[in-house]
Amino acid sequence: MPNILNKILEQIVFWMAWIIIPLIMEIIPAFGGFVILLKKKLFGKKEEKPIKLPEITLIIPVYNSADTLEACLASVHDSTYPTEQINILLVNNQSKDDSFKVYCHCQELYPDLKMQWLSAKQGKSKALNMALFCSDGKYIIHIDSDGVLEKNALENMVIRFENDPDVHCMTGAVLTSKEMIEDTESFRGRIVRRCEFLEYCQAFLAGRNFQSELDSIYTLSGAFSAFRKSVILKTQLYNTDTVCEDTHVTFQIRKLMKKSVHLCENALFFVDPIESGEKLYTQ
C-alpha cells in the first residue's frame, strides 16, 4: 500500500511540475505583458517627434543573402525615416553567393540611399565590430539581412530614444511575416506557421515587454537592436570568441556601464516563417 501511495504521489508531483512551471515561466509573464501593452496603449504618454530626426547608421551583416537582401533594403528605402539621415553599412561576412551583385543592383534602384559595402573576416561579431568603427550619427541600429522592417520601425525606435534619455539600448519586436503565413498552400503548414507567429508574439510582445517593464532584459535580439553610439563605443564591443555575442554586449551595458535596456514594442521587424514542423521543433 505505501508503494502505491508513493507512486501516486510521484505522478502528482510530476504532472504538477509540468503544469506549474509553464504557468510561472510562460503564462503569467504573457498575461503581464498583455496588461502592460494595454496600459501603454490606453494611458501611455504620447511621444513627441523631434523637428528633425537625427542621423543614424544602419548595420546589416551579409552572409549568402542574395535571396533576401533586396527586400531588406527596399524596406529601409520605403520606411518613414528620412533617407538622407540614414547611412547603411553592409558588412560582407565571406559570402559565396551573388550578394554583392544584389547590392550593386540596389544601388541603381535606390540612388538616394547612402550604402557602403565592407568586407570582414568570418564571424558575425567581427563584422559588427568592423562596422561600429565606421559608423556615423547619433544612433546605431543592427538588422539582419533576411528580414524586412515595418515602415515606421526606424522612426518609432529613434523617437523612443529621443523622448527618454534614460534609454541607452533597445531591442525591436521580431515577428514572422503574416502575408507569407496566409499565402501558405497546405493547411498543416499554415497551422504550423500560425503557431510559430504566436510563439514570436509571446516572446516579444509579452515576454520581452514584461522584462522591459521590470528592467530585466539580458539578451538583445540579434535580428533587430539599437544603441546610442556614445554608449556602445564605450563597451568592449562584440566578443569574437563566443556565439552569444548579443548576450555578452547586453551584460556589458547593464552590469559594467549600469545602463538600461528596453523593448521598443512598436518597432517591428518581420522574418520569414518556418518551412516545416520539423524545423519548428528544432528551433
Annotated model-derived regions:
Residues 1-52, 208:
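N-terminal membrane-anchoring/stem segments of glycan-assembly enzymes
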Residues 92-101, 120-122:
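A conserved acidic beta->alpha catalytic loop
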Residues 74-85:
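Short, acidic, metal-binding catalytic loop of nucleotide-sugar glycosyltransferases
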Residues 140:
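Short aromatic/hydrophobic "clamp" motif used to bind/position activated sugar donors
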